[in-house]
């Protein structure tokens, strides 16, 4: 399902999540969203069926896999400062967060 969503995005410009494809299969999307997704899926299926046996753009997309976001890493000293601040004040205001961020840079 994730690969289908990625393939749709690469081929037609609309990336759909695995959840959206799953909900489409289970008929749990709104009528409007079903109408938007059905023509794209039909087109993708026709292309996939017509290209059996020969490598195509769909095969290339599947080989690429889903791009993953880079994992965020926080320095130990910064993590300690954040944890101690949020223990003192679990719900800081926006200005406090900005001040804290500036002090940690």
Swiss-Prot record:
The cross-references to CDD domains, in alphabetical order and at most eight, read:
homeodomain
Q: Please indicate which superkingdom the organism of origin belongs to.
A: Eukaryota
Gene this protein is translated from: pou3f3
According to the UniProt entry, its GO molecular function terms are: DNA-binding transcription factor activity, RNA polymerase II-specific; RNA polymerase II cis-regulatory region sequence-specific DNA binding
The entry's localization annotation reads: Nucleus
PROSITE patterns named among the record's database cross-references: POU_2 (PS00465), POU_3 (PS51179)
Main localization is nucleus
Tell me if DNA damage is a UniProt keyword of this record.
no
Q: Name one Pfam family in it.
A: Pou
The record's comment on protein family reads: Belongs to the POU transcription factor family. Class-3 subfamily.
Q: One GO cellular component from the entry?
A: nucleus
Q: Which UniProt keywords apply?
A: Activator, DNA-binding, Homeobox, Nucleus, Transcription, Transcription regulation
Q: Which residues bind DNA?
A: 67-105
POU-specific domain residues:
1-49
Q: What is this protein called?
A: POU domain, class 3, transcription factor 3
In which organism is this protein found? Xenopus laevis (African clawed frog)
Q: Does the keyword DNA-binding apply?
A: yes
């Amino acid at each position: 399902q994730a690969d289908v969503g990625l393939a749709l995005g690469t081929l037609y410009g609309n990336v759909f999540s695995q959840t959206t494809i799953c909900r489409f299969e289970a008929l749990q999307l709104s009528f409007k969203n079903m109408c938007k997704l059905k023509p794209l899926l039909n087109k993708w299926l026709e292309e996939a069926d017509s290209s059996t046996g020969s490598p195509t753009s769909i095969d290339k997309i599947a080989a690429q896999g889903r791009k993953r976001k880079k994992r965020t890493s926080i320095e130990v000293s910064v993590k300690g400062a954040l944890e101690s601040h949020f223990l003192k004040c679990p719900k800081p205001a926006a200005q406090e967060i900005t001040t804290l961020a500036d002090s940690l840079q």
